[in-house]
Amino acid sequence: MPNTVHSGQFNLSSQALVIWHGPAPRADMEEKLKTFIEEGGLVLFLPDDTAHGTRRQFLGVSWGAMETAPADEYFRVESWDRQRGFLRDGTDQTPIPANRLRAIRRKPLAGKYRVLASWDDGTCALGQVRAGAGSALFLTTLPKYSWSNLADGHLLLPLLQRMADRGAERFSSAISLRVNDHA
């Protein structure tokens, strides 16, 4: 959702997941997203692609200034929670291939959040803030090849599938099953 759109143009009550790319939402859109999350919705925040950090926060989290990996090197995801959460292993114990994520650029998070995945230098790659029945997740890189290989889907696709599934639980558990769960 672009920051230039007025919140009155969106009805989030029928949505399971929102993907937000860019600076933190302002005023009425910020309140609308907070309510959406508190009612069980999920929002994935992606940083903007500018070099500077963001002053505005959402649920106490903002992005710092862009960092660039040294020449011929990458930031690599090294650890993530394989037991629970959005990046957990499948029911057959097959891990999400999050360690295939490579980034040239990233924007570190500032604020208080739970780390779901870390880069090889120990900084957060994916953070989570819970609010009410839902959550906001914050990625520190973009699915653009000038930033990372996130668009390859090794981490992003299972993350989005599981977030959409979890967000849909707020509507009716009778019509929604988690990926890899048996009916």
Give residue spans per PLM region.
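A conserved amphipathic helix/loop scaffold
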Residues: M1-A183
